């Protein structure tokens, strides 16, 4: 039996470990997320959070999440939003959403660190298939009575491919 030098063995282990990390890092994530910082943490009603994402797989269903980051000083337990989604070669369809962020009894929902809270809220009741492949546009405006709406740090949209069981 042949002896392997310790340095050769360490090199071999390092190369194998690095290759595994590289291969895991190259795995395609079936997720899109775009968050936009709200200027001065004062969300004006005419400031729209916009973006686009591409859908190639129309056979799979997706979950759509609203992602919102606010401070502990945010004055309300909810936020009203006007969310628009536009399919390729179609017009933008808007829906008004009352997003609950917390309650006086249980406090803020989501994850908090110090005085910053982030919440991800599922917008569709069940997984949604996109009927057309291509680029989808989204637009999000706050429609609260306060203008500007203070203490909102960022807002965005997350689209996740639903894994088949």
Cite the ranges covered by each PLM segment.
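Bacterial N-terminal signal peptides that target proteins for export
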Residues: 2-13
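C-terminal motif of bacterial Sec signal peptides marking the signal peptidase cleavage site
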Residues: 22-25
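Bacterial signal peptide processing site
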Residues: 27-30
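Short amphipathic, basic-aromatic surface patches that mediate peripheral association
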Residues: 66-74
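Short coil-to-beta strand junction motifs in C2/discoidin
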Residues: 75-81, 151-154
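Extended, solvent-exposed segments with strong compositional bias
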Residues: 101-130
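Internal, hydrophobic beta-strand segments that form the core of beta-sheet-rich folds
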Residues: 131-147, 151-161
């Amino acid at each position: 039996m042949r002896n392997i030098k310790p340095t050769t063995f360490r090199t071999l282990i390092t190369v194998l470990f690095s290759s595994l990390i590289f291969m895991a890092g190259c795995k395609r994530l079936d997720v899109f997320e775009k968050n936009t910082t709200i200027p001065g943490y004062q969300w004006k009603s005419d400031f729209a959070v916009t973006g686009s994402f591409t859908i190639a797989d129309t056979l799979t269903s997706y979950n759509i999440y609203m992602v919102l980051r606010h401070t502990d000083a945010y004055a309300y337990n909810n936020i009203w939003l006007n969310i628009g989604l536009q399919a390729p070669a179609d017009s933008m369809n808007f829906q008004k959403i009352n997003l609950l962020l917390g309650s006086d009894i249980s406090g803020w929902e989501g994850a908090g660190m110090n005085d910053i809270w982030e919440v991800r809220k599922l917008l569709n009741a069940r997984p949604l298939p996109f009927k057309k492949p291509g680029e989808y546009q989204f637009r999000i405006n706050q429609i609260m009575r306060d203008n500007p709406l203070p203490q909102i740090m960022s807002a965005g949209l997350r689209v996740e491919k639903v894994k088949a069981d």
